[in-house]
Amino acid sequence: MKAAGILTLIGCLVTGAESKIYTRCKLAKIFSRAGLDNYWGFSLGNWICMAYYESGYNTTAQTVLDDGSIDYGIFQINSFAWCRRGKLKENNHCHVACSALITDDLTDAIICARKIVKETQGMNYWQGWKKHCEGRDLSEWKKGCEVS
C-alpha cells in the first residue's frame, strides 16, 4: 500500500500538470450540479467519500498498478478498461483519453464515472468506496456544504 502511495506521488510529479486538490464542499457543489446525487441510487455522500479515499480529491492523482495499467484522476479510473493511454490492448469504454481524466475540469471524469456505475451496476469498482464508504452513514460528507 505504501508503494502505491509513492507511485501516486511520482505520477503526480511526472505529469507536469499543475495539481488541483479540491475541498470537500467544492466537490459537493460540482458533483451535485453534475447530477451525481442519487445517480443509480448513490447519495452525494457516496461520491464525495469515494473521491476522498481514491485520490484525496487530487485531480492529477495517478497510481501505477502491478499489471502496468494506471489509475487516473479524482476517481482513479483505470487505463486498461476505461480510458485510452495509447496502448492497443486497452478497452477505452469511456471513449476518452486518460489525460482528460487528470485535468481540473472534471467533466470527462464525471461522465466516465457515471458510465462505470451504470455498466458495473454500482460503485464496487472503487476499492476505496468498498472499504471506507459502503454501508455507512455518509451524511457527514456534505455537512456544512451549501448543497441540497
From Swiss-Prot:
Residues 1-19 form the signal peptide. Its EC number is 3.2.1.17. One of its GO terms (molecular function) is lysozyme activity. CDD domains: LYZ_C. Pfam families: Lys. It is found in: Secreted. Keywords: Disulfide bond, Glycoprotein, Glycosidase, Hydrolase, Secreted, Signal. GO terms for cellular component: extracellular region. Residues 20-148 form the C-type lysozyme domain. PROSITE patterns: GLYCOSYL_HYDROL_F22_1 (PS00128), GLYCOSYL_HYDROL_F22_2 (PS51348). Disulfide bonds join 25-145, 49-133, 83-98, 94-112. The active site is at residues 54, 71. It catalyses: Hydrolysis of (1->4)-beta-linkages between N-acetylmuramic acid and N-acetyl-D-glucosamine residues in a peptidoglycan and between N-acetyl-D-glucosamine residues in chitodextrins. InterPro entries: Glyco_hydro_22, Glyco_hydro_22_CS, Glyco_hydro_22_lys, Lysozyme-like_dom_sf. Glycans are attached at residue 58. Belongs to the glycosyl hydrolase 22 family. Monomer. This is Lysozyme-like protein 1. It comes from Homo sapiens.
